[in-house]
């Protein structure tokens, strides 16, 4: 997480965040509907915090990589806002869904306009928007994530992406329904391929914490074309990516 607490220190991390959160680490289970995720060790626990004062605190397996799945939707939204501005909201809403993140029923009732960018339907529409704008979307998306996190070793996990493609029937249904309501411009298989790659991108807690610093330090706005590893240097109108 990117935080702005002047008094934050390693002792606070250990005594508050770790003690409060670690007991919940054994609750729940992996997403077994994606075979490649079902076999991940569930006993790993890591935490990393970067402050906007350039302090870093880590605990446990903070540098262990994992596929970020729906966290990728934040990066997609930042890119789409940079490219589309307020026009984005003509295709995706801003409201809580009130239903499951992968609901087909709500999407049908609302004629193919997803409630928000963070449910699967909204993320799939954003994927379509990126395909419309970017000449080399997979490469440009990865370049953005590498740039904002300052780690050029970040990569797509092809095994996870393939596992999702082979078992992503509900996401395929969502994409077909979006296409039916004319809210998808590109080929369905092309959209799904890129969407599953985004979800598969592999980062660590350290990488993610670093990547979200520009969002925490929102006085310095940015676009996907203007990121450097050093937080003070961003370029864009502030309203774009807040």
Regions picked out by a protein language model, each given a short descriptive name:
Residues 74, 78, 202-220:
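Active-site-proximal alpha-helical segments within enzyme catalytic domains
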Residues 54, 67-86, 211:
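Active-site SXXK
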Residues 128, 176, 210-213, 239:
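Generic alpha-helical structural context detector
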Residues 2-28, 80-198:
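Active-site-adjacent helix/loop patches that line small-molecule binding or acyl-intermediate pockets
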Residues 201, 221-242:
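A penicillin-recognizing enzyme superfamily signal
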Residues 63-65:
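A short acidic/small-residue loop/turn micro-motif
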Residues 10, 68-74, 119-123, 168-171, ...:
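Short alpha-helical patches at coil-to-helix transitions and adjacent helical residues
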Residues 21-59:
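A short, well-structured edge-of-sheet supersecondary motif
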């Amino acid at each position: 997480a990117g935080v702005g607490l002047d008094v934050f220190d390693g002792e606070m991390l250990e005594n508050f965040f770790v003690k409060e959160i670690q007991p919940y680490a054994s609750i729940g289970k992996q997403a077994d509907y994606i075979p490649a995720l079902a076999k991940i060790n569930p006993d790993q626990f890591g935490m990393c915090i970067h402050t906007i004062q350039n302090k870093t605190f880590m605990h446990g397996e903070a540098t262990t990589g994992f596929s970020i799945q729906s966290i990728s939707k934040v990066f997609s939204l930042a890119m789409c806002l940079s490219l589309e501005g307020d026009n984005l909201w003509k295709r995706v809403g801003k409201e809580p869904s009130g239903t499951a993140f992968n609901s087909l029923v709500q999407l049908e009732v609302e004629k193919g306009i997803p409630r928000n960018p963070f449910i699967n339907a909204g993320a799939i529409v954003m994927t379509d928007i990126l395909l419309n704008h970017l000449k080399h979307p997979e490469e440009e998306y990865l370049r953005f994530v590498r740039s904002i996190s300052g780690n050029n070793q970040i990569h797509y996990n092809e095994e996870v992406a393939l596992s999702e493609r082979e078992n992503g029937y509900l996401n395929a249904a969502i994409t077909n329904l979006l296409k039916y309501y004319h809210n998808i411009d590109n080929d369905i298989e092309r959209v799904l391929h890129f969407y599953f790659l985004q979800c598969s991108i592999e980062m660590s807690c350290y990488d993610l914490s670093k990547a979200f610093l520009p969002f925490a330090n929102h006085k310095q706005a940015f676009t996907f074309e203007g990121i450097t590893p050093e937080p003070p240097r961003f370029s864009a109108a502030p309203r774009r990516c807040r």
